[in-house]
Amino acid sequence: MKTGVLPVIILGIIVWVGLRGTPTAGDQPAGKQGQGKGFPDLVAALKATPGCLGVETAKTGSGKQVIFAWFEDKKAVLKWYHSDTHRRVMKQFFPGRDYRKPLQEVPEDGGPILAIASITFAEKPRFKETPLPISQISIELYRPVSGGISLGGRFAPEGLKVPKLRDYTPKGK
């Protein structure tokens, strides 16, 4: 297995566990649904992580379950990675596994990070690396670029500073 693949799978499993209790349109609000037996509420744990600016969940038209988590910087992402919740779930799925140093490729002074975790469920397990019935799993990291527009609000949390973002919302609204 290529270096770095297993950590992505592990993070994906953690996302899967969190999404099992994640609402989609028409569902109950987060925290009102029962979590999988013995699984923590990952969305709540992400939101409670120092430096996490906000969390959103979604289900795409293609069937992906997605968590969007915005962090102030690399330090904040590492706080989540090393949190008790995250480590406990990693150990639960892969006990005794040694992990490489996370975020080695991410510069220390790079600013905010958007982590997008997605998973697509399948009828049966497809990968030897995990017993999960999935066809796809991914953890991707992104950074904001200058520009964009908004009117009446943004998808990103207000605490995320985007250079040269044009806000057309009338004052007082």
Region spans (language model):
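Positively charged n-region of N-terminal signal peptides that target proteins for export
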Residues: 1-5
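Short, well-ordered beta-strand segments in beta-rich or mixed alpha/beta enzyme
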Residues: 58, 62-83
